[in-house]
Amino acid sequence: KHVYVEKPMSHDVFEGRVAVAAQKKYGVVIQHGTQQRSNAGRAGLHDQIKAGKWGRLKISYGYCCKPRGSIGHKKFGEVPAHLDWDLWKGPAVIEKFHGNYVHYNWHWFWATGNGDLNNQGTHELDVARWAIDDDQTHPVRAMAIGGRFQWKDQGETPNTLFGMAEYPNGQQVFFNVRNVNYNGYKRQVENQYYFEDGGKIIGNQYYAKGSDKGEKIDFGQGKVTPGGNWGSFVAACRAGDPSMANGDVNDAHYGCVLGHLMNNSYRLGEEVPFNLKAGKFGDNKDAAEHFGKLHDIMGKGVGVPEKDNYYTVGPWLNFDPQKETHTGDFAKDANQLLKDPNNKGFEVPTIDKV
């Protein structure tokens, strides 16, 4: 059957790889629920970026900064009579039931979700990766720094995160998650583009290096299958043509893996004092600058004091884009995160069994 799959397509790297193999074997349409892929204007902008209209793209930056709130604490207890708990869990291995595992808060536990990075952030991660050169699939290394600040609740995933990834050609993706609310909060769910000559695109404005005066740009119209995400999916199914999907299985996989790798780094991180020196950015001045902006918001806006607060700083994780495995330092532990353990009876099949 053809499949329209909501984001994120996968909960781990292995699941995505299996989906790619299944699509290749059966030749069906698989369309990801990343609606920006049906936006002809966004496609047109990316065509111009790749053609070098503003010079070479250096950093493609995604933001998932939307206010959320504490989920509190739910006690472990009996499964409600109306809930088929085993079916609800599916492949996820969860020993005991509590109310925060069921809709919607399952997003904030590693067994069932990926945090906002690969929840809402899947949309902006996909756009960020879409803008870099077409021959780039997976990054060769990634890291993340963040934490779960202020709420002191039951959730496990970070509500604040700065992640970055480097691709084989040197292009980078930066990503910012910020969910903690505060007075004057700026909701920021968008993408920005930074070029090697110092220029940048924010919104529909291009800013030359050193200028605070933007020039409105015409995104143009790129090639997409008409009808929006639903209409294009139906058209692709009727035509029996997987290439008509706006956001096919490969793009879904590459975009989700980008988030998984940042999350893997975070999950292997260690606590360091909450200050500007927390990041492991080496000589990457761009990363230090953008992390500094996030830290400033968390300190001055949210009001997180430096004393007795900590960032979780993940290591740089190397990744082989062809083999889809971690290499080098931390590889043993990181590779354990590429495939989740599965609940009996709901095992994700291996590639040879799809």
Residue ranges and their predicted role:
Residues 56-59, 96-98, 135-144, 172-176, ...:
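Acidic/polar loop patches that form or flank catalytic/metal-binding clefts of enzymes
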Residues 153-155, 161-229, 248:
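NAD(P)-dinucleotide binding in Rossmann-like oxidoreductases
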Residues 86-171, 180-185, 250-254:
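Rossmann-like dinucleotide-binding domain that binds NAD(P)(H)
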Residues 61-101, 339:
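Core domains of carbohydrate- and sulfate-ester-processing enzymes
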Residues 237-354:
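C-terminal helix-rich "cap/oligomerization" subdomain common to oxidoreductases
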Residues 1-38, 314:
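Beta-strand-loop-alpha-helix segment that lines the small-molecule cofactor/substrate pocket
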Residues 21-28, 44-58, 76-79:
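Basic phosphate/pyrophosphate-binding loop/patch that engages nucleotide-derived ligands
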Residues 95-105, 226-237:
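Active-site-adjacent bridging/hinge elements
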